[in-house]
Amino acid sequence: MRLRSQKRGNKFVALPAKTRKGKGKKLKPKNLTITKKDEVKKIKKTITPKPNNIDEDDGIGEVDDIMDITPNYQGNNDGNELDLQQTPIIPNEIKDLFMGDNWRKISGPHAVSIITKPQHRRYIALKGTMGTGKTHVTVESLNKITGSTGSILLIVGRKELANEIERRINGSCKVYNYLEKEEFSNGISLSRGGLLTERCVFIVCVNSITTDLFKEDGFKTDMIVVDEVETTFMNIVSESLMTYSAAIETRNTLVEKLFPYTNVLLTIDAALAEPMVVGCAKMFGGKFEEYKLDLVRIRPPIYHRAVQCSTAYNIIDHNPLEKRYDTLFNAITYHVYELGKRIVISVPYHKTALQLKRHILAARPQHFHKIPHVVVYTAKTRDARLARIKALQTGEQYGIEALAKEADVFIFNSCMSAGHSLNMDGYEACFSYFLINHMTCSVMEQLQMTARLRNNNSKTLYWGLMNTMNDPLRGIRDIEELKTYSTMMRKFGKWMGSSFDNGIKGFKILLKMAYPNIVFEKGVVKSREYPYKNNEIINQTMQNDASVLRKLFINPEPSKWRFVTQEHEALYGKDLPPRQFNYYSTLSGLYNVVLS
């Protein structure tokens, strides 16, 4: 529209152009519709030029200020679509749970000084997103706390976490682990008798504190630590994890036999819910001073970019090498078979992990003359692997870190917390399947496991939501002091599980809380026909790849070669004599898969 100007006072004002009739008739603007494509163009114009330190794979620059929550997105060249609806509006169900007031931002050393300085009785709630050093603060506090008894009680929710904390303490003080029952009992007796000669840490699972060792007169300690408090106390409030009578007995032991006889109560979690803090303070009881500490991040966020894809993992594509990220499964096969990269995948179910492994092996192109070494690590595969080792059937690895180090594709159950960070050095891509369901662990625990994958070579997380369920937390019971927590968690679960859209929004908000610089994208969607759930194709491909139930495990000594049957679990061996068997090498070349 042509403009003319008119002087009004000392200013020139733009006026509409005159019509042909010269009457100055007002011109009605055309109805303009801003399309999604126009918004994308507008965003691209505002993107700053790409600096020299950009990782070509991630499309993300170095973070100058690790506390800056503004996305540092520089674009990418894989064709994915920038998600215009970045972090959705935060609903009250999440605000009320995780965004309370009066939290004090604090560094790790300062937090240790508050926890350990001798003063009156106190309750300390300590939270911090992934990478803030919560475990380090805990271990430092255990080493520096002073008191009259020399005893510290550390309560956890998983036995894996008990073993990891014992490892992290690393000989700085004596550790009594409840898994060693006789030694643990002797340590409790020494503490009650005042016979301890050094600082001692007693590590116990919350399910075991009702033992007779704690039912006597109150057990005196200098400090009680409840690590991953929401996971730990979920054992009490969840109907599926503990019976009502056992939950009441556990609550009574905490409130009557343990908390009144300590000077310091420290509860720790990544996103410590406000009602959980209130409930723990009520359980602590008596007179005390309360501290709410929020640890400042000490390292850059692990992920800068999150690509959302469909989770139809059981699709076998005839041509998986084309770069199409419409599903997580296609992104996985592209990274493995086209790029030859090592990847790590988290899934919420043991069964899902096994099915995903089968489909990854079945998607191998015919011209691809290697087989990826796919390792599944869940509670069931761990126990089965240990049983084979004890029976002297195989010489395979057992520990999660050793298995992750040798795998080409590492699939683990996100609901089985390893209790510690995993070194993923050499892994080029991370994939996460999420699920909102009362049969699996909480969404917070699923998210937390994504942050335990340290030192991976990519800053991109490929993720997708498998399914949602109405009222997924309906199995949470009301326990006196934790009643408000249970009520608000059920409300949060109902909102997350009420629709697939709410589930996606909820995970975006929680990812943004965990990784402040993260930028969301949507995987490229291209229409095509799928051989969807075609079992004939899957079974035929698996037979061609020798990924059948019966595998030959090769030991270094030929006299010990034998067949081992394990459902859906391919077994591998080293030092295979060449040209004596029909076999394929793994991608890394460390192992060979023998054809049945």
UniProtKB/Swiss-Prot annotation:
Residue spans of biased composition, Basic residues class: 1-10, 18-29
Name of the protein in question: Uncharacterized protein ORF67
GO molecular function, one term: ATP binding
Record-linked Pfam families: ResIII
Stretches the record annotates as Disordered: 1-30
